[in-house]
Amino acid sequence: MNTFFLRALAVSGLMSLTTACVTSTVDEMTFNEPTEGIGDSSVVILGRRHSSDYETEPDFVACVGDHITSHDESIRVIDELEFLNAVYPWFEPRTAPLYPKNIEQLLQQKPVAEKMLALKLEYLIWLDGSTVRSDGAGSMACSFNGCFGFGTWSHDANYEATIWDFTDQAEVGQVNTSASGQSYMPAVIIPIPIIAPVQGAACDGIGDQLLEFLSSEY
């Protein structure tokens, strides 16, 4: 039996035993929850952008919003970019309010107050965090015959959602979620990535908790 076949057989067996796995945890602290949902009011979910080189991933922000609306279509989640354009420049990194006490000062700007009224904005949810990839292990070699080898790496996701009540101008809750997972890339001629859905697990975890706060159905 030639070496090519033995190596292919060994890695094929490893592929059959390998699945990406994810572990996640969620912590919640909320108060003054709406008892019957938010009615015809709206909510906006924004990623924190502390500087030009740091921002919560826009795709994660969109994922959380989609999770909420897909489970309760009665909740109106304003698109992040739509909101930022509507209230420009008041929510740019240098001008965005950092604390609920800044809401009163923000609403003193007539264009902002009028826009918030038109949007029927009840809750603003800040998302802060990121998903990072750690150093991997393993090796892989490729030639005209294909690729052989095995690689692995991990992802860690940590996010915090802070809920502001625009009417009461107060913080009414926080949700923290963390997730970690191991991804793999076995290769028998063709590399086949087996990706751990770490960011997706974090999105589902934080989205479920926000649904419990916002929706009358949960």
Pin down the residues of each PLM region.
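Sequence contexts marking disulfide-bonded cysteines in secreted/extracellular proteins
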Residues: V22, V64, A141-F148, D204
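A structural "domain/chain start" motif
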Residues: C21-N102, L214-Y218
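Sec-dependent bacterial lipoprotein signal peptides
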Residues: M1-T19
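Stable alpha-helical elements in mature extracytoplasmic
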Residues: T56, F60, V64, Q108-V112, ...
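C-terminal/domain-edge helix-coil "capping" segments
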Residues: C21-S41, H50, A118-L119, T131-S134, ...
